[in-house]
């Protein structure tokens, strides 16, 4: 009989159910976690073998959604789930980031975490459910892990913070923030905001962290009932004499002050040459009786320690900047003649070539997600080719990092984008990172803001982005503005923030140590605000407001509203009217059920002709008014004249002219255009027309 252990607790407006012991028993740990009807199965498996020659922690997180969870079939020919969607990749990264710092330093065993969504309530997004499940599974397992962590989504509606808002609540929220942390520290923040103040953002982080303590406490209770004993793992200590020898040798050869102002490539080359020389000397000294990988790891850690100490002690960074100084910025807008909008944003050795393309509703992305279908009118894609770091690499489909950075840049711009009523275009922004030395995603946000303005997109305000770093030793810490890649590598925090002059639009914070306090976050916000304002000042010197008109190469979209009852008149019998209109004017015409008609053309004059014709077709015929019509039938007692949209009326033989008419054909021919006056419209809509006194016949 399966031994299932179930633990339930209240978390905000929802009940969380943790179930372990009955499913996936071959894994190191497995948890089935449910909130409402959203259920995720989380498994954790660790290898027994250490990858000693690997320079990074081999942790892999797979978040996967099964369509059966929502009672759906997968799309495509094979009717089977394929490669992960963008949403699945982003959630995998969301889970990975807060747990990675909580494994022991030097732990190099393979760990694979799989979170599978097996049931979904469209009102409860599975990401928070999966994060709670991963925290519980790692805590229950025998794998060394300094958790558990909690996770919370925070909304902001009517000046009130909402814990884990539903999908409907989130659509009305000014904030979508996910925060994860331990019982005492914050580890990760991911958010998009509708231009909120730094204090509002900080309060949201504090609120989410306080609320998630319930999760941590209840996971600890479950561990007491069902947790495994952690297996004994300790970092192998290097021989004391060897470590002292290496330390003295390295310190004697490295002068950190001589590295200040040296470019990234030369600095890394100097440091690598020193390390390889030390390894060669050590091999001779110890008769090759040493582990080269162990020595290199020791030297790398020593290098980081020396570089960190230098910044803390001297307040001088690798490139000679003070802690609060941003790099030199160079901006050009409108540099690509045939794109709808473009900008080149360069900050130090980081550069992004950003373009904006305008399209129609037909270009929008239709997303079939577990929580429901939706249409995305704003796309932002981030490309990071290998040449941007002077390397040779694989070129192909976007990797996880590119997808994550693109989504962050998109979050940064969403708050200032116009709605479909203000600007009826689908917009695609592409950032080509042409040089990279830190903060390329933030450069992409700056470039996106500039390119959108160059394209004439009426964004509400300019948006800039900056990455802040942290060096922390015990209670002593320093915040660095606009960090470069080496500072990111040796630092304890990556704090990326974007915003306008009035507030924050996006925040992504990742901590590499076991957490930071609210005070550090508050200082980071204040310094980021100063940096953003300086960057915005420089951007505004190039382009401050959107251009008044869109590119001559962009499609023109004209929108009009008609009575829905007249849609059939615009379409015509079998589509005859709209087909003839589109062919004559070379336009695309989209008609909505509510009577909104969009006319699309690369030629503004042609589009105007189509709009005028639609307005003519849908106009109400007024008694006493004069219209142009075409003779369509001739009979003994008169002629039938079609006005527009197939509206036909009779001109009686007595109403053709003031003279006596014996034969209608003596005065009128089929296809002849004539002016007619509407005399009467009966209840059935039949019109009585007159040509008398109007036409020269």
Curated annotation (Swiss-Prot):
GO biological process, one term: mRNA catabolic process
A Pfam match: S1
Keyword line: Cytoplasm, Magnesium, Metal-binding, Nucleotidyltransferase, RNA-binding, Transferase
Domain KH: 555-614
Localization in the cell: Cytoplasm
Family: Belongs to the polyribonucleotide nucleotidyltransferase family.
CDD domains assigned: KH-I_PNPase (cd02393), RNase_PH_PNPase_1 (cd11363), RNase_PH_PNPase_2 (cd11364), S1_PNPase (cd04472)
Enzyme class: transferase
Cofactor(s), by name: Mg(2+)
Subunit structure: Component of the RNA degradosome, which is a multiprotein complex involved in RNA processing and mRNA degradation.
Single GO term (MF): polyribonucleotide nucleotidyltransferase activity
Record protein name field: Polyribonucleotide nucleotidyltransferase
